[in-house]
C-alpha cells in the first residue's frame, strides 16, 4: 500500500466525529483508514480487503503499538464497498470503543485498546483516493 494521503496535527478528541470520504480505485485490492499518534502508533487501523491473500470483501481492524507491533486482528463481514465507487466513513470514539459508521449506515465497533482520549494523525493508504476529511 504505497499511495497515501494524511492529515497531521488534527485535534480529533472524545465526542467529536471524523468523516472520511473518497473513491475506491477500480482495480483495488485493499485500502486502509488509520487513526493514531504516528505511523508507528495507530489506535485504529481499518483495512478494507477486496482481494488480499485469502481475504475477500472483509474489514480487518487492528492497532499498532510503538516498539511492540501489531496486536490481535478483528474481522467484520460488513463490507458495503465497491470498486470504483465513492465511500464515506464516520468515526467517533470514547475511552473504550471506536464506533465506525459505514457508507450504508451499518456500524462496526473496535476497542480503543490504549484508552486514548485524543489523536492527531489520520491517514488513508492503499487503493483509494481521499476526497475529503471533516471533523465536527
From Swiss-Prot:
Matching InterPro entries: ConA-like_dom_sf, Galectin-like, Galectin_CRD
GO molecular function, one term: laminin binding
Galectin domain residues: 4-136
Swiss-Prot/TrEMBL keywords: Acetylation, Lectin
Coiled-coil residue spans: none
Binding site for a beta-D-galactoside: 70-76
Sequence positions bearing N-acetylserine: 2
Cellular component terms (Gene Ontology): extracellular space
Name of the protein in its database record: Congerin-2
Originating organism: Conger myriaster
Amino acid at each position: 500500500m504505497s499511495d497515501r494521503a494524511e492529515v497531521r496535527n488534527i485535534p480529533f478528541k472524545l465526542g467529536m466525529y471524523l468523516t472520511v470520504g473518497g473513491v475506491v480505485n477500480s482495480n483495488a485490492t485493499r485500502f486502509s483508514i488509520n487513526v493514531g499518534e504516528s505511523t508507528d502508533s495507530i489506535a485504529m487501523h481499518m483495512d478494507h480487503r477486496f482481494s488480499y491473500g485469502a481475504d475477500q470483501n472483509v474489514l480487518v481492524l487492528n492497532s499498532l503499538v510503538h516498539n511492540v507491533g501489531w496486536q490481535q486482528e478483528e474481522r467484520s463481514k460488513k463490507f458495503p464497498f465497491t470498486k470504483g465507487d465513492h465511500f464515506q466513513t464516520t468515526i467517533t470514539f470514547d475511552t473504550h470503543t471506536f464506533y465506525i459508521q459505514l457508507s450504508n449506515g451499518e456500524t462496526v465497533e473496535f476497542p480503543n485498546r490504549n484508552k486514548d482520549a485524543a489523536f492527531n494523525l489520520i491517514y488513508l493508504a492503499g487503493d483509494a483516493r481521499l476526497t475529503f476529511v471533516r471533523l465536527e
